[in-house]
C-alpha cells in the first residue's frame, strides 16, 4: 500500500523514544531512562508541533489567509518551525530574536525564506517580543502567533506528544521531565499524562542561572531555548511537583555524553533534560521506575556554541 505525504506539515509528530541503555549501564542507573527525540520532526525540533498548531488554529479562526504576514519573537526553534510551515503554505514571515542566538539558527531561518530582525541581546526575549508587537502595528494583515500566550501551544502537546509517550511506553511511565521555555510542552504533556495516571510525577526543568520557577528571579545562562526569564502565560504551574535546576556545564556534559555513548547528537536544552533525568534516576526512591525526558532538538544547531567549542 502506498504511503505518500502531501505536505511537510503532515510529517510532524510520532517521534521515537530511545532507552539510553549504554548510559544506564555505565552509570549503574537503577531506573530506565527514555529520551523522546524531537529532532525527528521535519524542521528539526519539538517546535514544529506548535508552529503547525498555531498557524492552522489561526487559519481556522480567519486570522490568517492569503497575503498575510506572520510575525513572531523567537529564540530559534519556533521560528524555524514557523518558517518551514510558512514556506509550505506560502506566507511571508518576519522573525524577531535577540542577537545572542546562534549563527546556525539564523542561517537555517534564512534558508526557509524568513526575514530576520535582530534585537539587543541584553534585553533578552522581552526585547524581541516588544519589537514584534511594533512591527505588527506597522504591517497590515499581519498575525503574531504568540507562542508564550497561545493556548494552541499546550493544546497540541495534550493532543499529540503526551498520547505518543503514553502509547509508546504502554502506559508504563512514572516520571516526565522537560525544559520550560514557553511551558507548552510541560503543560500539555503533563496534563495528558496526569489525566491517564494522576500518580505520574511531572518535573519542570529550568536553568540554574535563571531560577524563575523555583526562586522567582531571572538571570543569564547558556541553555538556549529554556529559561525565558519570566513565568510564561501558557505554563500550568500546578502540573509539576518539582523544579529541577540544571547548570550550563551539566547541560553541555550530558549532551556530549549522549553523543559519545549512544551516538545521538542533541542540543543544549536536550542535554539539560537528559542531565535532569539521569539525576532523577540516581535517586534510590526511583529504582525500577521509568523516566521520560523530552529532548527538543539536535546538536547540529549548536556547532558554533560552547557546546562544541569548549
Language model features with spans:
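PLP-dependent amino-acid enzyme catalytic core
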Residues: 1-310
Amino acid at each position: 500500500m502506498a504511503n505518500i505525504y502531501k505536505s511537510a506539515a503532515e510529517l510532524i509528530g510520532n517521534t521515537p523514544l530511545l532507552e539510553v541503555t549504554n548510559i544506564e549501564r555505565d552509570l549503574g542507573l537503577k531506573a530506565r531512562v527514555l529520551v523522546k527525540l524531537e529532532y525527528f520532526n521535519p524542521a528539526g525540533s519539538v517546535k514544529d508541533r506548535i508552529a503547525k498548531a498555531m498557524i492552522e488554529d489561526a487559519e481556522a479562526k480567519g486570522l490568517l489567509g492569503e497575503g498575510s504576514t506572520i510575525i513572531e519573537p523567537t529564540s530559534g526553534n519556533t521560528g524555524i518551525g514557523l518558517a518551514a510551515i510558512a514556506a509550505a503554505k506560502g506566507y511571508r514571515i518576519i522573525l524577531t530574536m535577540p542577537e545572542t542566538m546562534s549563527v546556525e539558527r539564523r542561517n537555517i531561518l534564512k534558508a526557509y525564506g524568513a526575514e530576520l530582525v535582530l534585537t539587543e541581546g541584553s534585553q533578552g526575549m522581552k526585547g524581541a517580543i516588544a519589537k514584534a508587537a511594533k512591527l505588527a502595528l506597522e504591517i497590515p494583515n499581519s498575525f503574531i502567533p504568540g507562542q508564550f500566550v497561545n493556548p494552541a501551544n499546550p493544546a497540541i502537546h495534550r493532543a499529540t506528544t503526551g498520547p505518543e509517550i503514553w502509547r509508546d511506553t504502554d502506559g508504563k511511565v512514572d516520571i516526565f521531565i522537560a525544559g520550560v521555555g514557553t511551558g507548552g510542552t510541560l503543560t500539555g504533556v503533563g496534563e495528558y499524562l496526569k489525566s491517564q495516571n494522576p500518580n505520574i510525577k511531572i518535573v519542570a526543568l529550568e536553568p540554574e542561572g535563571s531560577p524563575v520557577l523555583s526562586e522567582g528571579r531571572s538571570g543569564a545562562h547558556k541553555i538556549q531555548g529554556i529559561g525565558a526569564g519570566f513565568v510564561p502565560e501558557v505554563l500550568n504551574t500546578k502540573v509539576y511537583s518539582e523544579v529541577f535546576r540544571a547548570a550550563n556545564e551539566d547541560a553541555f556534559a550530558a549532551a556530549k555524553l549522549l553523543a559519545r555513548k549512544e551516538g545521538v547528537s542533541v542540543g543544549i536544552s536536550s542535554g539539560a533534560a537528559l542531565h535532569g533525568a539521569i539525576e532523577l534516576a540516581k535517586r534510590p526512591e526511583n529504582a525500577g521506575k521509568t523516566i521520560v525526558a523530552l529532548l527538543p532538538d539536535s546538536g547540529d544547531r549548536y556547532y558554533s556554541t560552547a557546546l562544541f567549542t569548549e
